[in-house]
Amino acid sequence: MAGRDPRDRAPRVRNRAPAAVQITAEQLLREAQERQEPTIQAPKQRVQDLEELSEFQARKRTEFESRIRYSRDSILAWTKYAQWEASQNEYERSRSVFERALDVDPRSVDLWIKYTDMELKARNINHARNLFDRAITLLPRVDALWYKYVYLEELLLNVSGARQIFERWMQWEPNDKAWQSYIKLEERYNELDRASAIYERWIACRPIPKNWVAWAKFEEDRGQPDKAREVFQTALEFFGDEEEQVEKAQSVFAAFARMETRLKEFERARVIYKFALARLPRSKSASLYAQYTKFEKQHGDRAGVELTVLGKRRIQYEEELAYDPTNYDAWFSLARLEEDAYRADREDGEDVEPMRVREVYERAVANVPPALEKRYWRRYIYLWLQYAAFEEIDTKDYDRARDVYKAAVKLVPHKTFTFAKLWLAYAYFEIRRLDVSAARKVLGAGIGMCPKPKLFTGYIELEMRLREFDRVRTLYEKFLTYDPSLSSAWIQWTQVESAVEDFERVRAIFELAVQQSLDMPEIVWKAYIDFEAGEGERERARNLYERLLERTSHVKVWISYALMEIATLGGGEDEDGNEIEGEAGDADLARKVFERGYKDLRAKGEKEDRAVLLESWKSFEQEHGDEEMLAKVEDMLPTTRKRWRKAEDGSGELEEYWDLVFPDDEKEANPTSFKFFQAAQAWAQQRAGQGEEGGLSYDLPSDSESENEDEDGDNREEEGMDQD
């Protein structure tokens, strides 16, 4: 690299602008082509006399002989040599070369074909025939030689000779294409009987469904439908009735049915389809069934179409279940499909047995979920319920339906979980059979094995329908002994006692309920208070509120307490339909409740609850109070202020938040700033009220006004405006 001359480097292009004249790739190629030097061509030699010809031929033969001497196994060299001799009209020499080549490789198909082509070009027909005889004798499994031989004879209009060649060929039992060529030869010369005989020999040699169908189609096309039926019947007898053979012969059945359809023999076609489908499993006859469905849609009645669609869907569901036997959705679909088919047959007046439906249900319930988890059993249990409903409603086999319920109950692992819907369905089945004692035994057994709220509730609902109130009370006692924390159960029991107007028992039940550790005690207290309020017992309701406030001082309790004091209790209608006026409420008592609630929430520092209480108090004063009390409450309403506090993540940074600021809290925390703030607020309101033309008052409020500003802030502002 160090010794390279710097002048050898390519010049650096300084001007990168495009040239004025652009040169295309096409121009470059054209110039390159034009500048190429002409290739050297060998001089042409002309043969002037026989002596020169002999010399030329001798030289060429020497070259060919030298070439085949060094590459004796090269068939291409032998072929070129022989073809050159033939081009010199030296056919004897050409034959000699071909024979010498055949001695080297007598099984070269290409060599035989080139040899025969040479004889045919020289119009030596007999020589070519002799060569074809030798070739097919030596190579009988090479179809190309047979085809060329037959083509030669037919080209010479020697049909009998071509037939003889085919006969020799058929003795070797060639492939189907050879048989078809023989048949087409006979068809070209209208020898249909001979062609039919060839079909028969072909079938004897290769009895596969495709060949049977081709033979029958040939007979149909030449106007022999009876012969075509005979062919199909022979084929079906040959294949037999075994499942494996029928599966193999599906194409024969389909072609047979299509032929009958073309001949307008629809009943024959339907029988053929049904015969084949009855001997094949659904999973192996999808294609045949699709053709049958299409046939019924075109030529069948409504019942036939429905039957085919039913079968097609049945195959689909069976395939899904074969892949996953625990696919209960597929079992449901298959069971409903069979039920619909059973009902349709009964509506048509047919005497059918429900065996297929029962078989589906038995197969379905045999696939028990693999895990003892309720989520896997939910869909499975519905199979049993649907099975029992089918036996009860459709077949009217009540004993079998009872057996289904018993089997389902026995199968469920009740120690782990149970299904109340199963027990209740079983019990209501016994009720429909007018056996109340059996229904009670079923539900009692369910509660004894695995008690659960839904089972108790269903049993109680049953007894309520039967108007057995003593049994209902007993069941509620057992229910609440099992789980005394269920608030809904206590409330339902009181509703039952209220319906029979046993109010003392209702109060006793409520008293027991509020003493328990309930899951939702608030709804029990609310129901208790609503009951007393509904009966017009204001004092009892007031006592309940006081007891509840001892347990919790939630803002909703205070609001509800206050609204109870203002509400009218005990109204309604008597037995004669006359309206009874209730006891009117007392607004002062309600206001005192609001004040108590506000003070209690303020003491506990519940700002949001105080704001909610004040909003309810404001609504109360708007409806039941006067302007003075409304103004007082409005002065107590909080305002929102933006404040800062340290972040909770411990980073020391300040974060912004909105806080509720109550006037009484501000006054108590900083009286001086509160007075100033009140004065500024009054000044702002005064300025907004008077506009630019009015004068402004800078008088601070007096001490007496300051003391009462929580009560009459708005009145103070009005007085200040009047003084101005």
Swiss-Prot record:
Cited Gene3D superfamilies: Tetratricopeptide repeat domain
A Pfam family matched in the record: HAT_Syf1_CNRKL1_C
Main location: nucleus
Top-level taxon of the source organism: Eukaryota
Assigned protein family: Belongs to the crooked-neck family.
PANTHER family for this protein: CROOKED NECK-LIKE PROTEIN 1 (PTHR11246:SF3), PRE-MRNA SPLICING FACTOR (PTHR11246)
Compositional bias segments (type: Acidic residues): 702-724
InterPro entries in the record: HAT, HAT_Syf1-like_N, HAT_Syf1_CNRKL1_C, Syf1-like, TPR-like_helical_dom_sf, TPR_rpt
Subcellular location(s) per record: Nucleus
Keywords: mRNA processing, mRNA splicing, Nucleus, Repeat, Spliceosome
The organism of origin for this protein: Cryptococcus neoformans var. grubii serotype A (strain H99 / ATCC 208821 / CBS 10515 / FGSC 9487)
Region: Disordered, residue numbers: 681-724
GO-annotated cellular components: post-mRNA release spliceosomal complex; precatalytic spliceosome; Prp19 complex; U2-type catalytic step 2 spliceosome
Protein name: Pre-mRNA-splicing factor CLF1
Record SUPFAM superfamilies: TPR-like (SSF48452)
GO biological process assignments: spliceosomal complex assembly
Assembly notes: Associated with the spliceosome.
Keyword Repeat: yes
Role description: Involved in pre-mRNA splicing and cell cycle progression. Required for the spliceosome assembly and initiation of the DNA replication.
The organism's taxonomic lineage, starting at the top: Eukaryota, Fungi, Dikarya, Basidiomycota, Agaricomycotina
The HAT repeat ranges on this chain: 55-87, 89-121, 123-155, 157-188, 190-221, 223-262, 264-298, 308-340, 352-386, 396-432, 434-465, 467-499, 501-534, 536-567, 585-626, 635-667
